[in-house]
């Protein structure tokens, strides 16, 4: 009956959303069990539980809602129902369970006792006390029995444990009684109801089945269950194990007994999470929490408040799937567990939603054995949904509710209020554990368990985290959201405030404006009215009455009238508008103090005040004074004598201190004199002093040698300078002197050159139109082109490599030729052909031979001076010395690029120039003189230079420009060999190589010298030379020669299939250099080489391999590159390169001729020497270095030279210097010390001179610009050139060097000037180094070789065009372009001699230069640049005072002060209105 009633009540109360059926089932079990409890709790529920139920409703489980309907009944039912519709039944079930004493029977064991309470969890006492049913005592005993007998787990056997669990559960339950404390007895009133609910909610009560417990999980689950928090965990465990069993066994009666524990046990593991959540709320909650994790979806929420609440969360899963099947699924699991454990629990789940079946299962028979079907399954479903909806609402009630939710009893608790809650707690635990644990037993622990967590901190039903969402996270989220909203709100408020203020301000302004306009109008109107009154009046009067009167009278009358009126004050108009507030007046003076007021009368005597209260007792008075001293008492009797004292005898005293010592005794008498000792041994002889260091060798010595040469240096002046003496050797060159005339012709040649330039001009245009245009010129060389192909092979860079390897060793020189190959492009400069005349000088080249002999720098000196003068005047002239290379002249074509390469090392510019030498090619005939170059044997020393030859050659490259002088060079030839050594070397090496070296003559360019200096202070010399070369004064010379070469360069570039620019000139120079290095002889005779010969050479495998290596860097397969090469073009280029460079195997001679043009070598040298520009001589050196190696260089390694040259940045200068080269050889020795010394001593003046000279426009253009020309080859592709250079440097130290410098300098800026400066270094040389250092495109270091340059994709033609334009602009190309170009390259080597000279006897050179300058004055360079503004002079003294000025006009009278006036005005205005 109770159950039924309960159900009814539940139904009524629960009816909320849940189905009545649920209600019925859920409570039924419980009520029967604890009818009392049911009645009591339920009824209580109505009262106290009402709230609980309400909470239930809030939870949103229909069950709960129902429970709301009937407070107590509902509460417990709700829980159950919550779990499932059957949850309502569940309470019954738990009841039944409780009733069921045998755990085996879920229904009966726990029904009576358990049902009432939530589950075993309510302590028996609790049950008894809590349940109104009167189950309390009985219940408790019942529970004990059940626990002991029915709980499979040993845990439950302990009554105390059970009690504790129950209490804990209860405490956990919603009821306010202890939350989770073991002793938490739910209020008895509440408890009963709760109990009922619990029983129903938890199968536990009803389905306490011992077997289930045993089978599933022992009661141990309950243990967990009982404690609100921990029991849940345990429940879960039990549930997990029990879940299937529980489900299977409808009667979780055993669980019922301790509904809580059982429920817990039945709870699936999944439930555990849920339970834990719920556990936090109450024991009941725990039950809820126990809903499996799966349950936690749904259950989590339910657990939060009660079974009901739990249901809510469960609703998502538990409800639908949970009860019946999902042992695993959260909700389901819980449901299953609950069912198994406790029908109620299951029902709870079901109640949640879904499993009506389960609910039925859950509903167990009461103790009576009735099984309550979960007819309210439908209710459960509904409940669940509602629960979900209401869950949040119920949050507030969660605490209390939880209890009810946890167990069916909770529902009861609801009815009962707190007490009910407590009971529910117990159940809750059980239910949670059982998985049915949800809020109320009836609700269905599972559902409740799942939702249990929902209680406080449980996540909403819809939360995927289910039980794992902690309330604080939600809270935090809400807080943050609120904060954000508040922030926005405040922001908006602030904004609104601002807007309001602005509006107010605007309104205020508007009002003010309105007021002002109004005032104005008023004023105006008042004025009008005042003025208008009389007139109108007059008119009227006149017309009406006064017509007859005299107007005068009328007016008189009016006046009198008005006056009287005014006096009477009748005319006063209406008050005008209020005037504007006047400006605040000044503050008044402080007033005088007022007179003191009269004293007021005396006041009346006040009435007597009331009598005061009695005073407090006064403080005790102070202590009285001390009394008098008492009299002394009488003396006492005498004391008796004391006993005799006794003591032991004392120890003996210490001995006294020793007495003071007596006075000293009288001194003894003097002893007899000792005998004389034996004579001492004689001292050893001192060590010999350290031998003094050998004094430094006087530089003069070397000069002495040169002195001999001096004689040769018929050149009187040079002769004076020891150097000139050396020049004397050149005396042979002196013979060249005639060539000197040639040199004059050179000038003519220059004119010719200009002519050439004209020609060049054509090329220039071509260049402009299409970089190809330049290439076009090369086209003519087409024949050589054929060789070109082989060149390609060479190109691969094998030569480069060779050069590289040789660079350090010996014939790096060949390498340089490779670069000249680049010059090939210069070939077009063929125009330089005119230079050919220089070729004549080439004949002089033989004289050059003496130059060789001239080892003495003198000889080269003179030639160098010639070169310089030539450069200054006719570059060709100086080149004359290079002339020796002239023989290679045939190589004239070479001019194009090869020379450039040579130049490259010394000066990038030259590389270009060599091209021009092409014209010298004709001189090639002179080529034979080239052999004279052999004479240059001196050069041989150069040969040693040869070793450094590579350097020398490279250096020579720069000289290349001088090459043109090459013709003169013939004489120079010999000279060259001397200096260049390289030339000599080549001669030695073979006609072809010697020829190549012959070009060396240009080497003269002292550059080599620098190398010598390298040994001692290469850097200094490099610096000097580079500075010097850059100086404007010397630049003209250098530029003159070098410039020309540039043009040729352009042709070099060619665009490859890949679209990359390919520099045939460069390639040609590479190939030539490679061939030379490899000792291969092109053609049968050194004088004439046909393009076919070259082509044949190019076809050689080794050459192809070399080319392939050279080209590889480009990234394209070397093979393809080779295939894509136009061998004809390459051979032409090579031919032109060789001819221009004089490198051609033996063709070099031609270049020499160009050298002739220009001042004679000796002149130049002497000029330079005289002008302190020895540095200049030196610069040529770079080319020279190669030569130097031979004689003086023996002490200098090629690497040193090359590095020096590269660092020196002499490459650009090289060209002109070349001539000096011959002397170079000697120089080297000197170089080490002398140059260094000189540099050290005269570094400033030397540098300044050099700089001034080199920086002179002419020189600069030459050095920077002209050299650029060599660059021209580079021009085709600036980068490429650079690359090429680097490639050269890589391939051969000397070759690479020369090539690098020459190209790099010319290329550096892509212009004539650019070249010399190069981006990396001051000069080509520097640049070359730069390359190595990655200064320029990193070709050098980067394995750039051609590849890099190609990668750069430079357009050589374009570059050539630019360079040529630049040269033309500077007038560099006029005579020298061609001359310089080819041949000079070779001559470069001679350059070294110049340097050598400087090196060997720097002082000599200095003297020579100085003499020269003294005699001729500084080399006339272009006018110096405008000096910097002088420092402002000191401020002059103050001058005498000037006469007084005229008297000024009288000033106008000042305006009257405004203030007064304004005040007046204001007043008047004020009156006006």
Swiss-Prot record:
Residues 1-572 are annotated as: Nonhelical region (NC16). It is found in: Cell junction, Hemidesmosome; Membrane. Residues 1-474 are cytoplasmic. This is Collagen alpha-1(XVII) chain. One of its GO terms (biological process) is hemidesmosome assembly. The chain crosses the membrane at residues 475-495. One of its GO terms (cellular component) is collagen trimer. Glycans are attached at residue 1404. Keywords: Basement membrane, Cell junction, Collagen, Disulfide bond, Extracellular matrix, Glycoprotein, Hydroxylation, Membrane, Repeat, Secreted, Signal-anchor, Transmembrane, Transmembrane helix. Residues 57-96, 111-120, 170-184, 1198-1210 have a biased composition (Polar residues). It comes from the Eukaryota. The lineage of its organism: Eukaryota, Metazoa, Chordata, Craniata, Vertebrata. The keyword NAD does not apply. Residues 1463-1473 have a biased composition (Basic residues).
């Amino acid at each position: 009956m109770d159950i039924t009633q309960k159900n009814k009540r539940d139904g009524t109360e629960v009816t909320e959303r849940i189905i009545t059926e649920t209600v019925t089932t859920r409570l039924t079990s419980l009520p029967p069990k604890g009818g009392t409890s049911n009645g009591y709790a339920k009824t209580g529920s109505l009262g106290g539980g009402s709230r609980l139920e309400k909470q239930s409703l809030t939870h949103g489980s229909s069950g709960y809602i129902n429970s709301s309907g009937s407070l107590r009944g509902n509460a417990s039912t709700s829980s159950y129902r919550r779990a499932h519709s059957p949850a309502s039944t569940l309470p019954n079930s738990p009841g039944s369970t409780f009733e069921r004493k045998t755990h085996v029977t879920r229904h009966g064991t726990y029904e009576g006792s358990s049902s009432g309470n939530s589950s075993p969890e309510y302590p028996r006492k609790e049950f008894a006390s809590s349940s109104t049913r009167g189950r309390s005592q009985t219940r408790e005993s019942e529970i004990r029995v059940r626990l002991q007998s029915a709980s499979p787990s040993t845990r439950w056997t302990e009554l105390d444990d059970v009690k504790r669990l129950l209490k804990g559960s209860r405490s956990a339950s919603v009821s306010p009684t202890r939350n989770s404390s073991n002793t938490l007895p739910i209020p008895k009133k509440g408890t009963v109801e709760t109990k009922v609910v619990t029983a129903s909610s938890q199968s536990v009560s009803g389905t306490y089945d011992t077997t289930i417990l045993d089978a599933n999980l022992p009661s141990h689950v309950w243990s967990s269950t009982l404690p609100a928090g921990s029991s849940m965990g345990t429940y879960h465990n039990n549930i997990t194990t029990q879940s299937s069993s529980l489900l299977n066994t409808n009667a979780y009666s055993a669980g019922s007994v301790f509904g809580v524990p059982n429920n817990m046990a039945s709870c699936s593991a999944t439930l555990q999470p849920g339970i834990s959540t719920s556990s936090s709320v109450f024991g009941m909650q725990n039950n809820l929490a126990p809903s499996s994790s799966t349950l936690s979806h749904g259950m989590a929420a339910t657990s939060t408040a009660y079974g009901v609440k739990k249901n809510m969360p469960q609703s998502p899963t538990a409800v639908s799937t949970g009860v019946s099947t999902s042992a695993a699924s959260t909700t389901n699991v819980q449901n299953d567990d609950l069912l198994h454990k406790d029908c109620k629990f299951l029902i709870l789940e079901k109640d949640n939603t879904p499993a009506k079946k389960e609910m039925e299962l859950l509903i167990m028979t009461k103790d009576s054995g009735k099984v309550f079907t979960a007819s309210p399954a439908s209710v459960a479903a509904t409940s669940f949904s509602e629960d979900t909806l209401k869950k949040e609402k119920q949050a507030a009630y969660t605490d209390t509710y939880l209890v009810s939710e946890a167990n069916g009893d909770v529902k009861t608790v609801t009815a009962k209020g707190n007490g009910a809650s407590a009971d529910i707690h117990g159940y809750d635990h059980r239910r949670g554990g059982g998985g049915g644990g949800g809020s109320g037993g009836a609700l269905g622990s599972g559902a409740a368990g799942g939702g249990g967590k929902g209680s406080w901190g449980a996540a909403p039903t819809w939360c995927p985290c289910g039980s794992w969402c902690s309330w604080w996270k939600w809270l935090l989220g809400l807080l943050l959201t609120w904060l954000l909203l508040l922030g926005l709100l405040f922001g908006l408020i602030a904004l609104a405030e601002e807007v309001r203020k602005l509006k107010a301000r605007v309104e205020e302004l508007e009002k003010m404006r309105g007021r002002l306009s109004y005032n104005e109008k008023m004023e105006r109107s008042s004025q009008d009215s005042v003025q208008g009154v009389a007139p109108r009046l007059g008119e009227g009067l006149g017309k009406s009455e006064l017509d007859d009167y005299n107007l005068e009278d009328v007016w008189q009358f009016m006046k009198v009238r008005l006056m009287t009126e005014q006096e009477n004050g009748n005319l006063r108009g209406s008050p005008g508008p209020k005037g504007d507030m006047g400006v605040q007046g000044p503050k008044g003076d402080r007033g005088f103090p007022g007179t003191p007021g009269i004293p007021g009368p005396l006041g009346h005597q006040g009435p007597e005040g009331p009598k005061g209260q009695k005073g407090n007792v006064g403080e005790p008075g102070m202590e009285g004074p001390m009394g008098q001293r008492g009299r002394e008492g009488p003396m006492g009797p005498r004391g008796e004598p004391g006993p005799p004292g006794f003591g032991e005898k004392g120890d003996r005293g210490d001995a006294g201190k020793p007495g003071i010592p007596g006075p000293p005794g009288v001194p003894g008498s003097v002893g007899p004199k000792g005998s004389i000792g034996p004579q001492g041994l004689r001292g050893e002889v001192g060590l010999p002093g350290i031998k003094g260091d050998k004094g430094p060798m006087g530089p003069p010595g070397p000069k002495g040698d040169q002195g001999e040469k001096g004689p040769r240096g018929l050149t009187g002046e040079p002769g004076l300078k020891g150097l000139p003496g050396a020049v004397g050797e050149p005396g042979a060159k002196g013979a060249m002197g005639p060539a000197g005339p040639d040199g004059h012709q050179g000038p003519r040649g220059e004119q010719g050159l200009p002519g050439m330039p004209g020609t060049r001009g054509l090329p220039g245009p071509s260049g402009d139109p299409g970089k190809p245009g330049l290439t076009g010129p090369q086209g003519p060389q087409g024949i050589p082109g054929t060789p070109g192909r082989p060149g390609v092979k060479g190109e691969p860079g094998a030569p480069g490599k060779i050069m590289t390897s040789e660079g350090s060793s010996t014939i790096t020189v060949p390498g340089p030729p490779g670069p000249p190959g680049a010059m090939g492009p210069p070939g077009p400069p063929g125009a330089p052909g005119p230079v050919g005349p220089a070729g004549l000088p080439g004949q002089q080249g033989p004289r050059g031979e003496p130059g060789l002999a001239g080892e003495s720098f003198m000889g080269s000196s003179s030639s160098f001076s010639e070169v310089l003068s030539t450069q200054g005047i006719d570059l060709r002239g100086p080149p004359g010395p290079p002339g020796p290379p002239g023989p290679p002249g045939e190589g004239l074509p070479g001019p194009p690029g090869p020379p450039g390469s040579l130049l490259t090392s010394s000066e990038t510019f030259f590389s270009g120039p060599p091209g021009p030498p092409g014209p010298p090619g004709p001189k090639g005939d002179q080529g034979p003189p080239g052999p004279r170059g052999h004479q240059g044997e001196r050069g041989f020393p150069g040969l040693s230079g040869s070793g450094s030859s590579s350097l020398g050659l490279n250096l020579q490259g720069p000289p290349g420009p001088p090459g043109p002088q090459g013709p003169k060079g013939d004489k120079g030839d010999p000279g060259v060999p001397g200096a260049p050594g390289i030339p000599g070397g080549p001669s030695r090496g073979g006609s072809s190589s010697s020829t190549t070296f012959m070009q060396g003559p240009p080497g003269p360019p002292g550059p080599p010298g620098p190398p010598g200096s390298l040994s001692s202070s290469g850097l200094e010399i490099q610096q000097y030379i580079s500075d010097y070369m850059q100086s404007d004064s010397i630049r003209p010379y250098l530029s003159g020669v070098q410039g020309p070469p540039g043009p040729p360069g352009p042709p070099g570039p060619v665009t490859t299939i890949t679209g990359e620019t390919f520099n045939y000139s460069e390639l040609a120079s590479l190939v030539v250099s490679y061939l030379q290095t490899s000792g291969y002889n092109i053609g049968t005779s050194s004088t004439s080489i046909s393009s076919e010969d070259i082509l044949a050479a190019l076809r050689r495998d080794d050459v192809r391999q070399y080319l392939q290596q050279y080209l590889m860097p480009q990234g394209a397969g070397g093979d393809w590159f080779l295939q894509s090469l136009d061998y004809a073009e390459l051979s032409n280029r090579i031919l032109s390169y060789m001819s221009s460079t004089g490198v051609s195997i033996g063709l070099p001679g031609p270049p020499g001729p160009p050298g002739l043009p220009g001042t004679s070598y000796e002149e130049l040298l002497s000029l330079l020497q005289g002008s302190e520009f020895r540095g200049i001589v030196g610069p040529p050196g770079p080319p020279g270095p190669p030569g130097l190696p031979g004689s003086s260089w023996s002490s200098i390694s090629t690497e040193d030279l090359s590095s020096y040259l590269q660092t020196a940045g002499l490459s650009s200068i090289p060209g002109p210097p070349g001539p000096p080269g011959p002397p170079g050889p000697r120089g080297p020795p000197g170089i080490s010390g002398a140059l260094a010394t000189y540099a050290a001593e005269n570094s400033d003046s030397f540098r300044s001179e050099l700089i001034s000279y080199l920086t002179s426009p002419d020189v600069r253009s030459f050095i920077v610009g002209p050299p650029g020309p060599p660059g021209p080859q580079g021009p085709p592709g600036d980068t490429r050139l650079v690359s090429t250079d680097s490639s050269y440097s890589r391939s051969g130290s000397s070759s690479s060097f020369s090539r690098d410098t020459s190209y790099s300098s010319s290329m550096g800026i892509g212009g004539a000037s650019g070249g010399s400066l190069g981006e990396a270094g001051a000069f080509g040389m520097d640049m070359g180094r730069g390359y190595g250092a990655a200064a320029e495109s990193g070709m050098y270091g980067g394995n750039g070789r051609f590849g890099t340059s190609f990668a750069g994709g430079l357009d050589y033609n374009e570059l050539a065009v630019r360079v040529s334009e630049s040269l033309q602009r500077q007038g560099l190309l006029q005579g020298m372009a061609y001359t310089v170009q080819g041949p000079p390259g070779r001559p470069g080597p001679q350059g070294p001699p110049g340097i050598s000279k400087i090196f060997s006897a720097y002082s000599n050179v200095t003297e020579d230069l100085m003499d020269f300058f003294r005699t001729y004055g500084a080399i006339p360079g272009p006018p110096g640049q405008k000096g910097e503004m002088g420092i402002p002079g000191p401020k002059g003294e103050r001058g005498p005072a000037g006469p007084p000025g005229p008297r000024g006009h009288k000033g106008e009278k000042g305006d009257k002060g405004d203030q007064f006036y304004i005040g007046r005005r204001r007043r008047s205005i004020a009156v006006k209105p």
